[in-house]
């Protein structure tokens, strides 16, 4: 079979470390009847061991050459191939509670994670290879340098745990950054339920818009000092000092005042 060269425009770095591959599959714990979706199967490093354990495996792939390769594999009859951009993919179009796994293209990881949060109610768990810097931000606690909008928003939907550190030499071609595997398990209302999710999302985005400024300055168009203090937020604190549940509480307090 003709060798496939990684394409930079698709953010392709192909995992080749057999130990890491085995660790990922063991973390996913696929059972024969599970509904599993793999994002970016690439050269099938994870696809093959998953397919061996599953009756059916959905894969989402944008690269036409890779799609053609997938169709020639010995286990191709187990694959349901969805060709196209994963950012446009309808995850709800696949019935059942889903496990989602993938070596995500680093150039679209943040918008893809926000998209996946929208389907959290129909997900059992997710396991992703990502740039380690992104995983650090996802799991970060308040008062840490990595804590920000991404962490707050994803922690609203998921319990998350970094599972595996992955060095650059585990890939071909080797990326210029370290990678990590993260497990994401949907947890409803772990930090409280936002009465108006769009308001909550807007508030969090504004809060972290200028990290060096106080929460009073960043949220001045939405909240005054009295509003902040009503839910236990010090107006002089910066956004990274405020726990996710405080953002939910503030959003609900402001939404309640507007009624």
From Swiss-Prot:
Cellular compartment(s): Cytoplasm
PROSITE patterns linked: RRNA_A_DIMETH (PS01131), SAM_RNA_A_N6_MT (PS51689)
InterPro entries xref list: KsgA/Erm (IPR001737), rRNA_Ade_diMease-like_C (IPR023165), rRNA_Ade_Mease_Trfase_CS (IPR020596), rRNA_Ade_methylase_Trfase_N (IPR020598), rRNA_adenine_dimethylase (IPR011530), SAM-dependent_MTases_sf (IPR029063)
Entry keywords, A to Z: Cytoplasm, Methyltransferase, RNA-binding, rRNA processing, S-adenosyl-L-methionine, Transferase
EC number: 2.1.1.182
Gene Ontology MF terms in the entry: 16S rRNA (adenine(1518)-N(6)/adenine(1519)-N(6))-dimethyltransferase activity; RNA binding
Pfam families xrefs: RrnaAD
Protein family membership: Belongs to the class I-like SAM-binding methyltransferase superfamily. rRNA adenine N(6)-methyltransferase family. RsmA subfamily.
Function comment: Specifically dimethylates two adjacent adenosines (A1518 and A1519) in the loop of a conserved hairpin near the 3'-end of 16S rRNA in the 30S particle. May play a critical role in biogenesis of 30S subunits.
Name of the protein in its database record: Ribosomal RNA small subunit methyltransferase A
Annotated source species: Neisseria meningitidis serogroup A / serotype 4A (strain DSM 15465 / Z2491)
């Amino acid at each position: 079979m003709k060798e496939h060269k990684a394409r930079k425009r698709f953010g392709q770095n192909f995992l080749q470390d057999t130990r890491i591959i085995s660790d990922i599959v063991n973390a996913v714990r696929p059972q024969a009847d599970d509904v599993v979706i793999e994002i970016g199967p690439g050269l099938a490093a994870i696809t093959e061991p998953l397919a061996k354990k599953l009756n059916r495996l959905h894969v989402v792939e944008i690269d036409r050459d890779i799609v053609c390769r997938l169709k020639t594999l010995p286990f191709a009859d187990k694959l349901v191939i969805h060709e196209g951009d994963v950012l446009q993919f309808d995850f709800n179009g696949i019935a059942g509670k889903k496990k989602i796994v993938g070596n995500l293209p680093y150039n679209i990881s943040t918008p893809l994670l926000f998209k996946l949060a929208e389907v959290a109610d129909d997900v059992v768990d997710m396991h992703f290879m990502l740039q380690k810097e992104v995983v650090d931000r996802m799991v970060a606690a308040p008062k840490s340098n990595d804590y920000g909008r991404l962490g707050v928003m994803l922690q609203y939907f998921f319990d998350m745990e970094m599972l595996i550190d992955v060095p650059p030499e585990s890939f071909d071609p080797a990326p210029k950054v370290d990678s990590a595997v993260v497990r994401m398990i949907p947890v409803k209302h772990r930090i409280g339920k936002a009465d108006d999710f769009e308001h909550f999302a807007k508030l969090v985005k504004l809060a972290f818009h200028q990290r060096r400024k106080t929460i009073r300055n960043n949220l001045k168009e939405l909240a005054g000092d009295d509003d902040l203090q009503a839910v236990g937020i010090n107006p002089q604190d910066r956004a990274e000092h405020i726990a996710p549940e405080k953002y939910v509480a503030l959003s609900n307090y402001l939404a309640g005042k507007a009624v």
